[in-house]
Amino acid sequence: REDLRQIEVVLDWQPLIQEHFQDKDIVRALKIIYCESSGRPNAVGKNTNGTQDVGLWQFNDNTWAWLKEKLKFTGNRSDPILSTKVAKWLIYNDGWYHWNSSKHCWRY
């Protein structure tokens, strides 16, 4: 089944996701990581507008810059711990819609 294959690819990240997400959100978070980066923290997606999406969560250049300014942190999007903490903040403060472009892949 496709859902199981998605989760198997990102099982290495399950402890990190469990540490930062509510139980009800763990599967969704793992599926987003699968859909966005196939669980690869160094994944880079190039966009037609010249920006890049980077890391497990595929944070866009503009979104990452905005979050760094807003939350006053430093660090790299390819850092799986940092990017997961930032994703957690974004999801629990602003919702899942930031990953709507891949929703066809991760929605239940």
Q: Which residue ranges define each predicted feature?
A:
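Export/targeting segments at the very N-terminus of extracytoplasmic proteins
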Residues: 1-39
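Stable alpha-helical elements in mature extracytoplasmic
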Residues: 13, 17, 25-29, 60-63, ...
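Catalytic cores of secreted/periplasmic lytic hydrolases that degrade extracellular macromolecules
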Residues: 5, 92-108
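Secretory-pathway/luminal and periplasmic proteins that interact with or process carbohydrate-rich
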Residues: 37-44, 94-99
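Second-shell loop/turn segments in exported
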Residues: 3-6, 16-20, 42, 46-47, ...
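Substrate-binding/active-site groove segments that recognize
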Residues: 49-69
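Amphipathic alpha-helical interaction surfaces
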Residues: 35-38, 62-65, 93
